Amino acid sequence: MQGSAAAVMLPASLALVRQAYADPVRRAKAIAVWAVGGTVAMAGGPVAGGALTSGLSWRAIFFLNLPAGLAAAVLLSRAPRSPRRVAPLDPAGQVTAVAALAALTFGVIDGGETGFGRPAVLGCLLLAVVAMAAFAIAETRAAHPMVPLGLFRSRTVTVCVAIGFAVNVAFYGVIFVLSLYFQRVLGQSAVTAGLEFLPMTALLPAANLASARLGSRFGPQAPIKAGLLVSVLGLVALLAVSARKVLLTAALVPAGTGLGLAVPSVIIVLLDAIPADQAGMAAGLLNSSRQVGGTLAVAVFAR
C-alpha cells in the first residue's frame, strides 16, 4: 500500500514543480532541491533502517513514512491549488500495464531466487511480454491513453527513460550486493553496514545542487554526461579493487556522486521536452522505468 501511494505521489510532486516554475532556470534549481529530498532519505535510510531492524523489528521501518507524510500533507495544504482537467480512465491500458509490471517483477524476483528455468517463472515472463504487447495495442486504440505512445517518438524522452532505468540498475545493484557482503562476509551489523554507504550517500545532496548550477552554465547535458562518466569510473573501480573494505568504500564515492550529478538534469531535460500538461505522465514513466531497473538489479545480483 505504501508503495502504491509513493508511485502516485512521486510523479505528481514533479508535476507540481513543473507547474510552479515556468522559468527554466528557476525550475532547474527547484528540481535539484526536489532531488535533494530523495538523496537525504537515501543517506539516512540505510542507517535508520539498520537501527530499527536491529533494535526493534524490520516492521518498524514502515512507520518512518508517517511523520514525513504528515509534514508533507501540512505543507501541501498551503500550496496553490492545481488546475484540474477531467480525463477519462483508460481501463485497458491500466490493467495491461499492471499485469505486465506485476508479472515481470514476480518473474525476475522469483527467478533470481529459484532459477529462471522453472515453469512458473517462464510463465510469468511470457505473461509480461504478452501483457506489454497488449498494453501497446490498447494505447494505440484508446481515445485517452494512459501513456500516449507518441511520447516515445521524442528521442529525448526515450533516452531519459533509458538513463533512469540504467541508473537504478547500477545504484540498487551495488547497494544490494555490498549490503550482503558487509553483513554476511564481514559479519557487520545492519547499522554498521548502513554506515558504510554514508561516504557515498552523504555527497549526493551536494551533487544534486551542483547539477543545477552546472546545467545553468553549460547546459543540462553537461552534468548528465559528466555524472554518468564519473559513475562509470566508480563502478569500474568497484570491479577492479580488492575486497578490502576501505577500497570498496572509497570506490563508492564516485559511483554514487556521479549519479547524483546526472539524475536532476535528466529530469530537467525530460520535463523541458514535453508540454506542461503531460509532466505528471512523463514523470510517472521515468519513475516506472527506474523502479523496474531497481527490481531487475536486485533479482539479477541475488543469484
Residue ranges and their predicted role:
Residues 1, 18, 62, 71-72, ...:
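Conserved protein kinase catalytic domain
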Residues 13, 119-127, 131, 143-303:
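12-transmembrane solute porter fold
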Residues 8, 99-102, 173, 259-261:
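Residue-level signal for the membrane-embedded core of alpha-helical transmembrane segments
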Residues 48-56, 108, 182-183, 214-215, ...:
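Interfacial helix-cap and linker-helix signal at transmembrane-aqueous boundaries
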Residues 1-92, 276:
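Helix-loop-helix hairpins in multi-pass membrane proteins, especially solute transporters
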Residues 13, 45, 67, 100-101, ...:
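ATP/adenylate-binding site constellation spanning eukaryotic-like Ser/Thr protein kinases
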Residues 32, 54-164, 170, 188-189, ...:
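Hydrophobic transmembrane-helix bundles of small-molecule transporters
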